Amino acid sequence: MSSTQGNGEHWKSLESVGISRKELAMAEALQMEYDALSRLRHDKEENRAKQNADPSLISWDEPGVDFYSKPAGRRTDLKLLRGLSGSDPTLNYNSLSPQEGPPNHSTSQGPQPGSDPWPKGSLSGDYLYIFDGSDGGVSSSPGPGDIEGSCKKLSPPPLPPRASIWDTPPLPPRKGSPSSSKISQPSDINTFSLVEQLPGKLLEHRILEEEEVLGGGGQGRLLGSVDYDGINDAITRLNLKSTYDAEMLRDATRGWKEGRGPLDFSKDTSGKPVARSKTMPPQVPPRTYASRYGNRKNATPGKNRRISAAPVGSRPHTVANGHELFEVSEERDEEVAAFCHMLDILRSGSDIQDYFLTGYVWSAVTPSPEHLGDEVNLKVTVLCDRLQEALTFTCNCSSTVDLLIYQTLCYTHDDLRNVDVGDFVLKPCGLEEFLQNKHALGSHEYIQYCRKFDIDIRLQLMEQKVVRSDLARTVNDDQSPSTLNYLVHLQERPVKQTISRQALSLLFDTYHNEVDAFLLADGDFPLKADRVVQSVKAICNALAAVETPEITSALNQLPPCPSRMQPKIQKDPSVLAVRENREKVVEALTAAILDLVELYCNTFNADFQTAVPGSRKHDLVQEACHFARSLAFTVYATHRIPIIWATSYEDFYLSCSLSHGGKELCSPLQTRRAHFSKYLFHLIVWDQQICFPVQVNRLPRETLLCATLYALPIPPPGSSSEANKQRRVPEALGWVTTPLFNFRQVLTCGRKLLGLWPATQENPSARWSAPNFHQPDSVILQIDFPTSAFDIKFTSPPGDKFSPRYEFGSLREEDQRKLKDIMQKESLYWLTDADKKRLWEKRYYCHSEVSSLPLVLASAPSWEWACLPDIYVLLKQWTHMNHQDALGLLHATFPDQEVRRMAVQWIGSLSDAELLDYLPQLVQALKYECYLDSPLVRFLLKRAVSDLRVTHYFFWLLKDGLKDSQFSIRYQYLLAALLCCCGKGLREEFNRQCWLVNALAKLAQQVREAAPSARQGILRTGLEEVKQFFALNGSCRLPLSPSLLVKGIVPRDCSYFNSNAVPLKLSFQNVDPLGENIRVIFKCGDDLRQDMLTLQMIRIMSKIWVQEGLDMRMVIFRCFSTGRGRGMVEMIPNAETLRKIQVEHGVTGSFKDRPLADWLQKHNPGEDEYEKAVENFIYSCAGCCVATYVLGICDRHNDNIMLKTTGHMFHIDFGRFLGHAQMFGNIKRDRAPFVFTSDMAYVINGGDKPSSRFHDFVDLCCQAYNLIRKHTHLFLNLLGLMLSCGIPELSDLEDLKYVYDALRPQDTEANATTYFTRLIESSLGSVATKLNFFIHNLAQMKFTGSDDRLTLSFASRTHTLKSSGRISDVFLCRHEKIFHPNKGYIYVVKVMRENTHEATYIQRTFEEFQELHNKLRLLFPSSHLPSFPSRFVIGRSRGEAVAERRREELNGYIWHLIHAPPEVAECDLVYTFFHPLPRDEKAMGTSPAPKSSDGTWARPVGKVGGEVKLSISYKNNKLFIMVMHIRGLQLLQDGNDPDPYVKIYLLPDPQKTTKRKTKVARKTCNPTYNEMLVYDGIPKGDLQQRELQLSVLSEQGFWENVLLGEVNIRLRELDLAQEKTGWFALGSRSHGTL
């Protein structure tokens, strides 16, 4: 009775992990014996002695990355770590696993006195920093299970593998295989490693209970009811328990509390086949990353060789136990091993002169002529601890930084003889970066930023020895061994997929026991065979549910059994009565299983390999160029088929194709159509050979094999089968690509398993993609490539010794013209077959056209071995390409290794600042590399080692790439390689950044999902957890930039936006006390990768303009995606959205012209300040128009366009681009080419009439547009490299075609100027844009608070009774006529206040009186307000009589207003209205002089007619005359503006055949045309005799047109060899000159 009770307690303790009593009893009864513990102890002692004598490559103690020190009792703080990695941060790799150190039964192994179950010392600091942990595991409050012994409830003690229960002698030691006495049990992280958390007595007690169960007579009872399905499930659960991350553990914990297991397994199915839906997929455990016998350098020669599973020779019944069948493998993937070797060389080859300087973030440098000019002076303020007051210097932009340091040291040191300038650095205040001493001041981006926005340049002088160097690499970092595989393991993964060595050993022990029983049986062979089949099925299921033909054939030799389909050929049962016959069957079956294990280990890169002697290694090599056989292989079957396919599809077939750079090498081949088959599992078996009509020696080295699985859908029941068969279309179910030549350039041979990607994902035949083992239930394709006695290797041919080069000008003019037309396409995507043929034929003439190399190489007819010498010599002799053009050679179209190596060589000249501009594209280009190691990878790693800014952004871009399932494996290795190259301090910094991002993401998600009324409280609570993060870590750099170092959060300045995504508005405390708080927006729910890409393109555009001497004054803010659906955005200070500016004039403010001008006037009251703001507005508005049009940015409303008080306009929120406009039914929401409205034109013109400033604006737009057009190839290259990034709106060539069409590279500059001018006119005249703004105003009214109505649009501040003084009397003195910004009247009001005898005078327009009254009506009932004068006037509303009448009415209104009830008369609106503005402070004695609305040109006194701007050129017997602008035309006699147009004749012209004219501009004295008028067929000699007559007329409808001015231009006086542009004076009759 007591025994039974104890047994029940034992099972109860183990049920916590979801393993039933029956399952665990069966597993233990068959696999475990107590005497294995003594053997394990003996093995461990020998293994420990071996490790002490020969340390492993990867040291768990040597890296010693300090963890965050935790004071005792701070478990709640440490619990915050849970979630970064998705696993328990208390896992101590330095502790012994149960397998390494078995418990001592005589001594308790409980915690030592004073020990804390949480780690106090240093763990591996690398443990956390790659994980997202967005599951919400970050918590600061202890839960009910967060007590000291809670960890002991998570799992039972581990179950070590036991020897066979049969009395069979062990195998003698074999050659090449360690003996059983020397086999050590490795520390596999996949198994339970909780000895440090489990008291020794409890472990001892449970093992003793196990002993009782096994030895108490229950063994036979248990054996009689063996359930192999249950065993498989139990082993799977054991494996999952040791490999799943913290999220699964939390889910399991919830399940235990609900009375169910952590995994929802089905009920007992004894005797039934293992169903696919009931078994978990194979899991990928953390590998055993170092050989226990030594590192890579001193390992024995045969230790890490691939070992083939050879058939077992004799005595299969004496096969070794499961744990002896497999040995630890350090690195089975040869490509990864070679990559690790390259990484070691790269780390050792980095020559660092001063390790201290590697911890600096250097300010980016982008030199340009403007910033280096001597004529540009800077006012710089330098602060220093040695000085009580700051120093102010005035120096040139071209002055170097060390010169400024020297000048400062003159004030801080009396004697400079012992002072080295190089020991000092200058740090911008508020940023954790440093200016580069040897570079000019003006070349630093920080200085350029300050100049652009008129910010004071404030620098701090610091000694290098006091600068924090926590990110610097050290000598120890370079000397420590590479931990690539360890870092790969730490990265976040889905469900682990590879079975562990212990679990597989346990399954093999079961198999061996059943085989022994089958061999020793005297009868009842079908039942014994069924148990063998069940054990084989369990092994195959654990090995990715793969059933090879050898296994199927071997099983067919067994008698029929219910576990599988009956074999086609029934065997005579009497044959198996002979023991030798049974041994032959078992021998074949064992060999087939070991072959499957070897295949599985090679495919999934497991941490072990079969310990069977023999290894296939080819010493003979045959060059592929001499191998003339056709490419052939056998498609056997697909494994792991979803059961739902059996009821949804039929007639499965596989389509195979060969491609190189996206181009198919031959027609695809298809297998026959097959149906489902059922052996051990469901399969689709073809077993068919595919033979391509392509010889191996004609295959390019980077040839990809693409296999696509198709099937026909089963017609629905009740439908006509014949009719449906005719209409059925095959559906693609999955695809996979694999290179035919591996990284050693050897042709693929042998059996391969390839995981299929779902057909819903992109099928990129143009690039390499790893097989899909990322998804645990992916369908697996088995292909058998032929094997041979030698390796077939692709050897790179040498280039030809000679390649002709010819001058482009030596071609015929017709050929030159055709080639130029082709080259103007700027991109290889739109080359036709005829274009390619012509380019390749004339390739030797194209050397002078450097940028055409990608087009020429894309036209190569073949990339086979025989064609490479000609291509390589062309590449070698090509003129050095600039880095912008070389980017085009990194596209998927060019997989050739030599081409990509040359491209990287040319890109190598990039500066660090330029590299950052193109880094996202280079990270995407890594997808197009065929192999893990490549010149591009080495280039990026080398640059990351030398610059922290590059390292920072490279890390976050690679981390984002982990989300790309097709390339996650590659990005895992690259990210691990980057972290290997980093120092310990930088790895810890990345760890903190990820931790902070996860905490913010959790908070943002909680605020977003909460009810609006509860959001503020949730935000405040969540910010406390962020404060705990900073209390624990001190400081952290923001992912936006490594220069932004913060030390805390400012809760009072944090809030959220009332939009759909509810982003957080956060304010961080700057570490630098001289800097301001850093304000950012954190978004959760929006994919910011598109915003990142758009801002990158705008930043590159801005740099192009600046380099060309045209600073468009663009506002570029930082934006970075820190994961899918979340990221950070920099907040621009002193900026407001157009919506908030416009609604200050009411909800219909979008239809008014003055809101923007009034807002800028309010914030820039001085005349000079306002003029500067308008100038900034003109430039930035022009830049925004060009950028948004070229990139096709849509969804433009007045809430994602912002304006700074300095006049700089910029766009935000780029959720739609490349023309993907939001639709209302079939109507596009964005109807105009870009946003350019009348209120923007009002600011530019200085009123509602066009002025010459508008000419400047149009010229700026056209000039900026043409400069971007010159770099069309750059933007096509950059966007083309991003086609595979996963952004939905940039996924195919149609999206790229939008940019191509917008840039119009085939147009001349003149045509492009005309084209963009028409776009400006179209946008300005669009009513849809204003209507869209108005609709958005209405939609946002629910988010507008009442405080938004308490300010006046023309007042920059709010004034009160207390601040201004009580008003005693007001009187409207007079009205005055004004001409700027519009013609009208202004009213002068005298304001008297108590306790003062001086009156103040204010000037207000009628519209401003009306705004005051409208906003008062929103606050008070109409009964408390005086009546306001009517705005409706019959006749002219701006006449003198109307103004006089309104003066009297307004005088009465304001008198009654100040005598209204106190709540009205004393409100802030009234006192703000009567408070003087800066414009009121001017002298009020005289009327202001009329001012022209044209701020840049005034008509000279006595001169009539104005001026016209023309551009005249002559080419190819054609005269081109571009009419650009006219300024200063006279008004008509009735005082109205004219409707001018231009008419020209080419005299002499008696027949009036040369008449040309422009369109009519309506109601303007300063029209813009930008129209090209062309005269064709005019010989150059005839041109000297001609005279151009130009007339400007005003169209008068039915009346005669009025002449406004004309000019005659003698063409012989112009040198038309070059284009002539200038202004010509208009008169009644005049001859014009420039």
From Swiss-Prot:
The keyword Acyltransferase does not apply. Pfam families: C2, PI3_PI4_kinase, PI3K_C2, PI3K_rbd, PI3Ka, PX. One of its GO terms (molecular function) is phosphatidylinositol binding. The keyword Methyltransferase does not apply. Residues 2-298 are annotated as: Interaction with GRB2. Residues 87-112 have a biased composition (Polar residues). Residues 259-270 have a biased composition (Basic and acidic residues). Residues 45-188, 259-315 are annotated as: Disordered. Residues 635-786 form the C2 PI3K-type domain. Residues 176-187 have a biased composition (Low complexity). It comes from the Eukaryota. Residues 375-463 form the PI3K-RBD domain. Expressed in columnar and transitional epithelia, mononuclear cells, and ganglion cells (at protein level). Widely expressed, with highest levels in thymus and placenta and lowest in peripheral blood, skeletal muscle and kidney. Keywords: ATP-binding, Cell membrane, Cytoplasm, Endoplasmic reticulum, Kinase, Lipid metabolism, Membrane, Microsome, Nucleotide-binding, Nucleus, Transferase. This is Phosphatidylinositol 4-phosphate 3-kinase C2 domain-containing subunit beta. It comes from Homo sapiens (Human). The lineage of its organism: Eukaryota, Metazoa, Chordata, Craniata, Vertebrata.
